[in-house]
Structure formats: structure tokens, C-alpha cells
């Protein structure tokens, strides 16, 4: 099935501004969000809206889409950030097929080594308690990352000196190398090892960063954790990644959350579950029992005749949706607890109850000692 035009999906014109795109996305995503709209097809509609917004809200992706449509050179599909491999924080990089092809055979489209390039994105894993995730918090984190050198301001040259044409590649930024391969001896082009592709070298390198233009430092950042975040969810801190190259923008920092389980509740999305043990008399006669919620304690009415497995729903007593779509519910699961130790009087009452109910009880010993007594009595 052919994909619909992204502008048509959001119901906007092709010259719509970023604010108009965002406004249309918010309106439609709220209408078709799976947590709100339970109609058939709402989930697919929401995915289509999210995919359209991801492309049209990004200047580069939008420009490529306007030129090539869905069959653009990169394709579009709402992949987003891949948070499957966590562990502290790390950079993201790697070239595509064209880079591999070009490095092996040479030729192909050459990148301008002096063009502005966005810095690498970084990732940090933050551990939260259940309460911190539910109510939100602000935490300070420390990460090691590359920052712009304060001495040379990212230039790489010693202040007061200038750059000159690289003597190794004569300013080309790349050098020809011959290699023995399975196809025979091939001539390839590689990035100049002296100037790293810039085509320039320093008269004298910066004494602080040794020509890199960056320093690796420990940086402290304040992270505001929104209410309702769940395990494996993430937030993006724009511009807090590695510094850009040649005046390009800095990358972003993605904070991925690890949420510890609660000792009281079990979480499922925005809903929470609480297990409540009730005694046999409470279940049979009914009662009012005080139970915990996220914010306080409330009285729960247990109707007479309540059985194990009965579930009560307390609307909007769950967790606030992180996207602002209301609150989840609190579900109370009932378990009727059978008494294990009874006094003689309690046993008499239970037998009397059984007789009144027309039941014959063949009482069984509860432990080895009782079984032994009955054995020697010949019972």
C-alpha cells in the first residue's frame, strides 16, 4: 500500500511553518493516541502521524522529502533513536554503504572535509526509584565527554598562530594508497593521516588540546525528569552531546531511564496494581479496608461474598501519563486468606457453620504431630 503524503497526513500545506506542523501534530496525536482512542486502526493512524511529524519537523529530512518524496536517498520511517544497547554513555557514528564502497574502490561522492558537521550524540543511563519516576525529580549527573577547548576555542592551533596548507596531501585532504586485495592491486583514496582530511595543518598546535580542538572533561548537568517516565524511556537534551566540527552544531545527549520496581505496587504503563489480602470473615460479610494509593490512603468497600480474584478499579488513581494524556488507574486484586491456625472455639464455630450450610466436614490434620496423634488413637 502506497504511503500517503506527509503533508496530507497532518492536514497542512506544503509551506506550513514549524509552529503549524507542531500544532497539527499535537492535535492529531492526542486524538489518535492508543491510550485514548480504542477504535480499530487508531494505532496505525497514530504511527502514521508520528512518522510524518518526525520527517517534516526536521529541516534536513523535510528538504529531502520535498525533493525526493518517500523514495528519497535515505528513506523515511520513523526509526528514531536506538536505545537497545545501554551502558553508561557512548557516541554514535558509522558510515553507510557508500563510505565502505568508496574506501575500497575509491571515487564516489567526496565529502567536503571543511564543511560543518554535527557532533556525535551521547547516551547516559539514569537509575530512578519508583517514586522518582512517578512524581518526577531533578537530578545532577556527571559525564565525561569532549568539550570545545577553552584555549584555542576549537580551532586546534596555538593562539596567535595560523594554519597552512597540509604538506602531506598538499591541501587535498586525502591521499592515494595502493593495496593488495582479493581483486588484485587496487589504488584507493584515504583520509590524510596528518591533517585528518581538513587539508590544513598548524604552524603550531594548541598546547592544551594538541590540535584536536576538544578536551575530554567531566561535565555536570542538571536533568529534569518528567512525571510518569517508565523503564527504558528517554529524554533528549539538545546540544549536550559532543561539539560539532568546523562550526557545526553540537550533538545531543539522550538520557535513558532505568526504573526500580515498587515494593507496594506493580506497574503496567500508567496503571498500577495492588494485592490486598482479606480474611474469610471480611470476604464473607463485607468490610471497609484502608488501602494505599500513590498520594494517600483511601477506604475501599469490600462487598459481602467477595471471592479471590475479584478486582476493583479506582479510576485515575494511577500514574500521570508522561505525554500529558491524563492518569492511569489503580487496580486492587483480592486474595481471600484461609486461616492456618484455629483455636478449638474457632474450629467449633467453623464446624457449626458447615452444618448450617448442609456440609459434612471430614477434618484433616494440619501437621505431622496431629497426624501422629490420630494414628495412635486409631482414628
Swiss-Prot record:
The primary location reported for this protein is cytoplasm
Summary of subunit composition and partner proteins: Homodimer.
Which Gene3D superfamilies does the record match to this protein? Answer: DnaJ domain, Heat shock protein DnaJ, cysteine-rich domain, Urease metallochaperone UreE, N-terminal domain
Q: Which InterPro entries match?
A: DnaJ (IPR012724), DnaJ_C (IPR002939), DnaJ_domain (IPR001623), DnaJ_domain_CS (IPR018253), HSP40/DnaJ_pept-bd (IPR008971), HSP_DnaJ_Cys-rich_dom (IPR001305), HSP_DnaJ_Cys-rich_dom_sf (IPR036410), J_dom_sf (IPR036869)
State where the protein is found: Cytoplasm
Q: Where is the J domain?
A: 5-69
Q: Which gene encodes it?
A: dnaJ
Identify the species of origin: Staphylococcus aureus (strain NCTC 8325 / PS 47)
Family matches, as PANTHER family = CHAPERONE PROTEIN DNAJ (PTHR43096:SF48), DNAJ HOMOLOG 1, MITOCHONDRIAL-RELATED (PTHR43096)
User: What is the name attached to this protein's record?
Assistant: Chaperone protein DnaJ
